[in-house]
């Protein structure tokens, strides 16, 4: 869709907005519309359902906020024909719903609405006031939400799906008056994690309503769109072109780059870029919640204690991930957004919880330590900078000696184009990296808990890597596990199935990455944790000693049993030998009987005498087994 600057003036908007809304837009210093706003507002303010796919930072939030406020305003303040005053909204009813996949995005959407509503005139004709209510998980409970809903009677609900479904299941909440529903980041809301709740909510709403779906990657939602109950929707796609004239899903103000780098150097390269580049605020994306927690703790500590050799004291880090409470996440986001100390550089370390829809002013740089497992998230991450036609840079780090450079071509198929850049030079032969690694090892040795968190982060990264959609590019077999472990600050490689990919000649002895550490004396800084560790260590020592004692007793018992068995076997052998001797004597006596005519009684007597003589002979020879003619004839038996 091509537009010129004149056609984007608010005066040329093809819909007659409420007077107060026109004045509010003028007061907020929005001189012109963006293409997505110029296309969407007239359709959604009228009687059209819309599916809007537009690049990040293109003004999508205002593109649906204005139609929502227009519809609510008309419903509250316009007098129907034949009536003396507007029809009041019944108790328990709402007029509009806006759904978002994350609490942070929902909060930011509410801030946009409230910013416009602050300019609603303080006049009797604008009563009741237009109000919004935020419904997100872990921020209060459903009972508190209901109390607020009944007391304030908001017309616009801004919510995440789970909490909204719980809220709408209450009997007192009515949906029959609803006029419009918006799904922001609709592709995420319609994927497996939210789809069931979202479809249930939509089925609870009136069929005669307007529906708007908004996202930078709406095509990822696929056929699920048809389950949203839209009526003949208009699909709007607002895209840009790069300097080669190719369609680009990223805004032209956003410079997308990638660098090939040794895994071990990723963290220090990131720090060098943050230290040396000029920017106000930056966002650095990490793979997992645990890795954000690990690197945030590490860098916050090292920044405070860093000397001139690796001066990173001007960097101020913030942490944002899904394991934080809602209150902590919103507070962090607020502090990062409002930070304005000119002597500091503000860096938000985050997972993909900060990838969608969040609009933070003055974010000039985005760095991705690793690409996201879902390629559709890549553009959402990058889109936190270069918003509203401001210049921004987004850089993704790819591992050397792997197939990861193929990711660039993979993203080009999705109309996302990147240029290659070189890592910043370390002029003194990796001196920054080496100094940082020494400080990192010292940091790890100070507290056993830090190393445990590092190991957990490392294992989490390997699992994260194994789940990449582009598995032919991101292969576990090609990773440099030792280099990655050093980047995470590990003292020793953990035992895990993926270790089989490490070549035998490269595998360090017992997995130690540097000097061997005595794990019995490797202590926790936390006194209670250390006390518990020492108690467990003592228990383990006693248990080992007890086990050793039992093994020794069992060995003796086994030996005694073995000796008895041998004696029993010897006794049986002697009996067998005596039996053979007896049989031999009997045969000899029978032979003599035949030759000499001895009778049976004499044979028996002679046999007994022969045995007695043989025994006497054995005794006279010291029990040596006898040496006579008769005995000699038995020796080979």
UniProtKB/Swiss-Prot annotation:
Coiled-coil stretches noted in the UniProt entry, renumbered to this chain: 528-597
A molecular-function term among this protein's GO annotations: RNA binding
EC category: hydrolase
Domain Helicase ATP-binding, first and last residues per copy: 41-236
InterPro entries in the cross-refs: CTT_SPB4, DEAD/DEAH_box_helicase_dom, Helicase_ATP-bd, Helicase_C-like, P-loop_NTPase, RNA-helicase_DEAD-box_CS, RNA_helicase_DEAD_Q_motif, SPB4-like_CTE
Q motif, short sequence motif: residues: 10-38
Superkingdom assignment: Eukaryota
Enzyme Commission (EC) number: 3.6.4.13
GO biological process terms, semicolon-separated: assembly of large subunit precursor of preribosome; maturation of LSU-rRNA
Compartments where located: Nucleus, Nucleolus
Catalytic activity, reaction form: ATP + H2O = ADP + phosphate + H(+)
Family matches, as Gene3D superfamilies: P-loop containing nucleotide triphosphate hydrolases
Nucleus found in the keyword field: yes
Keyword annotations of the record: ATP-binding, Coiled coil, Helicase, Hydrolase, Nucleotide-binding, Nucleus, Ribosome biogenesis, RNA-binding, rRNA processing
Compositional bias segments (type: Basic and acidic residues): 564-576, 583-598
Gly residues: compositionally biased ranges: 621-630
Record region (Disordered): 554-637
Sequence ranges assigned to domain Helicase C-terminal in this UniProt record: 266-444
Function per UniProt: ATP-binding RNA helicase involved in the biogenesis of 60S ribosomal subunits. Binds 90S pre-ribosomal particles and dissociates from pre-60S ribosomal particles after processing of 27SB pre-rRNA. Required for the normal formation of 18S rRNA through the processing of pre-rRNAs at sites A0, A1 and A2, and the normal formation of 25S and 5.8S rRNAs through the processing of pre-rRNAs at sites C1 and C2.
Record family assignment: Belongs to the DEAD box helicase family. DDX55/SPB4 subfamily.
Assembly description: Component of pre-60S ribosomal complexes.
UniProt name for this protein: ATP-dependent rRNA helicase SPB4
Classification lineage: Eukaryota, Fungi, Dikarya, Ascomycota, Saccharomycotina
Gene symbol of the encoding locus: SPB4
């Amino acid at each position: 869709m091509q537009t010129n600057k004149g056609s984007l003036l608010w005066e040329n908007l093809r819909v007659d907005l409420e007077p107060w809304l026109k004045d509010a837009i003028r007061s907020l210093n929005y001189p012109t519309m963006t293409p997505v706003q110029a296309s969407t507002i007239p359709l959604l303010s009228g009687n059209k359902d819309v599916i809007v796919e537009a690049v990040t930072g293109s003004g999508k939030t205002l593109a649906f906020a204005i139609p929502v406020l227009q519809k609510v305003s008309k419903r509250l303040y316009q007098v129907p024909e034949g009536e003396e005053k507007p029809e009041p909204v019944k108790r328990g009813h709402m007029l509009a719903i806006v759904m978002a996949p994350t609490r942070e995005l929902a909060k930011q959407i509410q801030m946009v609405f409230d910013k416009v509503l602050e300019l609603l005139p303080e006049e009797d004709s604008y009563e009741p006031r237009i109000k919004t209510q935020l419904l997100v998980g872990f921020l209060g409970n459903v009972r508190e939400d209901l109390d607020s809903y009944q007391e304030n009677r908001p017309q616009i609900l801004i919510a995440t799906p789970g909490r909204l479904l719980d809220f709408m299941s209450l009997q007192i909440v009515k949906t029959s008056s609803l006029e419009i529903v918006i799904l922001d980041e609709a592709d995420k809301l319609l994927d497996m994690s939210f789809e069931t709740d979202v479809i249930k909510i939509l089925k609870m709403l009136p069929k005669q309503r307007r529906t708007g779906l908004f996202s930078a990657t709406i095509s990822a939602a696929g056929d699920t769109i048809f389950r949203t109950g839209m009526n003949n929707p208009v699909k709007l796609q607002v895209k840009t072109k790069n300097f080669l004239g190719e369609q680009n899903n990223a805004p032209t103000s956003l410079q997308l780059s990638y660098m090939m780098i040794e895994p071990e150097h990723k963290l220090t390269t990131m720090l060098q870029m943050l230290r040396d580049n000029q920017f106000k605020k930056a966002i650095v994306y990490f793979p997992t919640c645990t890795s954000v927690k690990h690197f945030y703790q590490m860098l916050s500590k090292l920044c405070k204690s860093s000397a001139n050799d690796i001066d990173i004291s001007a960097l101020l880090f913030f942490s944002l991930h899904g394991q934080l409470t809602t209150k902590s996440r919103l507070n962090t986001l607020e502090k990062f957004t409002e930070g304005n100390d000119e002597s500091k550089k503000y860096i938000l370390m985050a997972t993909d919880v900060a990838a969608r829809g969040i609009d933070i002013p003055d974010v000039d740089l985005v760095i991705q330590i690793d690409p996201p497992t879902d390629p559709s998230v890549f553009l959402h991450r990058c889109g936190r900078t270069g918003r509203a036609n401001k210049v921004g840079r987004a850089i993704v780090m790819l591992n050397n000696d792997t197939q990861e450079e193929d990711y660039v071509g993979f993203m080009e198929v999705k109309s996302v184009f990147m240029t290659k850049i070189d890592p910043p030079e370390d002029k003194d032969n990796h001196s920054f990296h080496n100094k940082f690694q020494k400080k990192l090892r010292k940091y790890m040795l100070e507290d056993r808990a830090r190393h445990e968190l590092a190991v957990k982060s490392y294992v989490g990264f390997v699992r994260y890597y194994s789940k990449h959609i582009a598995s032919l590019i991101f292969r576990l077999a090609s990773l440099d596990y030792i280099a990655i472990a050093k980047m995470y600050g590990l003292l020793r490689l953990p035992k895990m199935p993926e270790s089989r990919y490490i070549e035998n000649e490269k595998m360090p002895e017992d997995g130690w990455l540097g000097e061997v550490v005595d794990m019995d004396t490797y202590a926790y800084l936390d006194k209670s944790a250390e006390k518990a560790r020492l108690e467990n260590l003592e228990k383990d020592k006693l248990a080992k000693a007890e086990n050793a004692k039992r093994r020794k007793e069992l060995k003796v018992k086994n030996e005694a049993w073995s000796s008895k068995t041998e004696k029993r076997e010897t006794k049986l052998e002697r009996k067998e030998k005596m039996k053979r001797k007896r049989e031999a004597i009997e045969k000899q006596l029978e032979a003599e009987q035949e030759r000499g005519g001895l009778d049976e009684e004499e044979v028996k007597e002679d046999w007994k005498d022969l045995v007695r003589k043989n025994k006497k002979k054995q005794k006279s020879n010291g029990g040596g087994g006898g040496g006579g003619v008769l005995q000699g004839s038995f020796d080979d038996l």
